[in-house]
């Protein structure tokens, strides 16, 4: 079995090398200098199955982040709808988590982009709640190895951690702005969900530090960040996951008491007894959708490499010993539609992706390889929150209250741990005369819940998601009356 695994690994390395050598000829163009011609070369006139109207101004392609290693990240960019002109609206970067999940397959094509993949991946449909009504939307497949993003150095895939991801994302931004200089002075915000609860604040912190020389050509007009159902702090995330499962009748009182007795979540390595108790929670969630506990479970064929049963609830208990290694944000039905669509040759051709046709294996919405090899070295992002709040950045956190994976309880614990003074107490916000959720304003931060939404708020509650991002971008308060 070990020999077969080694042989498979060698085959993957060879396939990857062939792909990247074929891409290497285009690396000079991915560096990002010059704007104009490179920008226009990335324009996507129309994707297969895209509705004829309304018009969507979009670009896609590769931007180099490390010439020596041959690393390039793939992006999909939508200009904001007119009135005012796109150049006058904010630029919003969106990152999905996992680690290992595609911001194109999830954020763009399933959640908040103007074009969503229809059922069975047959076509695209217009999303009337696309966030490009409020901002220019930039979706990035990160880290390398995710989606169409690639590296010419196979060892990169074994060295992935939060610092690596932040540095590559920063290099991407610097080079992307060279290609799209008309957006260089726009207000810039970073957003994302699930494990992007690490990516987003860490990238914001890196931009903040590099911005200290305001005269530098790499200065980025960062104004704030917003994260949804974010993994933030190991202790509070794990504590909240267990408490949410018990309080929502997923597990019995006896199981919860066992967890409280055997689990010290302040230790990153769980004991055997704690691991066994927590696996009872995961086994119960295997019967429903952990990412939206009140939604029907997707019953599509789950024999693929991205099967939730295999990827999330493997019998190998070592998978959960150090961290809860489940893709943060996985929806098997929508990911299947995205995989059907983005694996079509005519789509990839129109998308300027996988030009050589030698992508190692099929395009996947989530990569098991990235998830299982990722070095989870950062246990808490809360110190970054404290730092950037003091620096004056706008910081929002929102949470769909039906998510069992990164539940609202976890986020409340995290926010309360910051010790910020309350500005406006917990209260309801409204959409169409109905309670859309609750929010609390602190001095320096806002936390919002979205009633009835799961892990993927823009997918589950699109109208609420659009109202939320509009309030965030404009620095406004959510409506508090019917």
Curated annotation (Swiss-Prot):
Main location: secreted
Active site: 194, 403, 455
Glycosylation sites: 152, 269, 301, 354, 375
Natural source organism: Oryza sativa subsp. japonica
Biological process per Gene Ontology, one example term: proteolysis
Protein's name in the database: Serine carboxypeptidase-like 26
PANTHER family: SERINE CARBOXYPEPTIDASE-LIKE 33, SERINE PROTEASE FAMILY S10 SERINE CARBOXYPEPTIDASE
Annotated TM spans: none
Keywords: Carboxypeptidase, Disulfide bond, Glycoprotein, Hydrolase, Protease, Secreted, Signal
Family membership: Belongs to the peptidase S10 family.
Keyword Protease included in the entry's annotation: yes
Protein purpose: Acts as a positive regulator of grain size by controlling grain width, filling and weight. High expression of GS5 in the grain is correlated with large grain size.
A molecular function (GO) term: serine-type carboxypeptidase activity
GO (cellular component) term, any one: extracellular region
Highest taxon above the source species: Eukaryota
Enzyme class (EC, first level): hydrolase
UniProt induction comment: Induced by light. Circadian regulation with a peak of expression at dusk. Down-regulated by abscisic acid (ABA) and brassinosteroid (BR).
InterPro entries given in the database record: AB_hydrolase_fold (IPR029058), Peptidase_S10 (IPR001563), Ser_caboxypep_ser_AS (IPR018202)
Disulfide feature: 101-366, 263-274, 298-333
EC code(s) of this entry: 3.4.16.-
Gene: SCP26
Entry's localization field: Secreted
Secretion signal span: 1-28
